[in-house]
Every structure is written in C-alpha cells, then in structure tokens.
A protein has these predicted regions:
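Non-catalytic linker/capping segments at the edges of enzyme domains
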Residues: 1-47
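Conserved small/polar residues in nucleotide/adenosyl-binding loops
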Residues: 137-138
Length: 138
C-alpha cells in the first residue's frame, strides 16, 4: 500500500472533520492506495461511542462518507460531494479494538455521478458496515 498525501494539510482554514490532522474533534483519517481501492486504518476512540464500547453509527457513516470522497479524489483526480448514501450496519464495532480497516472503490461512473462502494472491517477482518454512495464529481 502507498500512503496518499493529504493535499490540504497546512492550508489555512482547512478543518475537515474527516481528514484534517489538526481538528481536535475530528476523526483524523489517513488514506492509502491499494490497487483499485483506497484504504484507511483507523483507531476507534471511546469518545465516539454510542452505546458502551460500541462505535456510534453516525461516526461509522462519517468514516464511510470520507473514504468514498477520497476515492473520487485519488482515482478521478477531482473532488466530489455526496448526493446519496445507503448504509447497512451488519455487526457492532468495538471502540476497544486496536484498529478498524475501511476499503472503498469505484463501481460505476455515469456522467457526473460516481458510485462508490465501501466496507468497514473490524480487527478480525469481519465486515461490520457496508455503504454505497453516489457522489457528484466537480
């Protein structure tokens, strides 16, 4: 896997909840390229729990949305905004896990709409969450 350099790091005013490294409230995702996929390895934190030791579903949705936007950035060399997101929560994610892995890839491009699929895996490699996003690329 090859690390993707964040092109906005150091830009004045850059404070993305998903990927800004200096946003104290944010999730601070980093990304890697692995063939057709973009990958993120992320450490759950207790402040992002919903129920005791369980990663909040809204935070999972943020992670999925962010990685899909980075797929558009990396693979199409443009930015995109989410127009639709369908998410299935299959298994809870433990906030005590050492890490989780997210993987996403483009499934289809229709004019200015990009369909991206993403999966979130727990530390044991089990699929916990699946999303399909439609993003409008700019």
């Amino acid at each position: 896997m090859k690390k993707i350099i964040n092109p906005w790091k150091g830009l004045e005013g850059y404070n993305c909840f998903g990927c800004a490294p200096n946003n104290e409230a944010g999730v601070k995702m980093e990304f890697y390229e692995d063939g057709d996929e973009v990958v993120s390895i992320w450490k759950p934190r207790p402040e992002y729990q919903g129920w005791i030791d369980t990663l909040h579903g809204g935070i999972q949705a943020v992670l999925m949305d962010e990685i899909c936007a980075w797929v558009v950035l990396r693979k199409l060399q443009t930015t995109g905004v989410t127009s639709k997101m369908e998410t299935r929560y299959r298994k809870s994610v433990d906030t005590k896990d050492s890490h989780i892995v997210l993987r996403a890839s483009i499934k289809e491009v229709k004019r200015n709409i990009v369909i991206v699929e993403a999966k979130l895996y727990n530390k044991d490699g089990e699929v916990c969450t699946e999303s399909v996003l439609s993003l409008i690329h700019i």
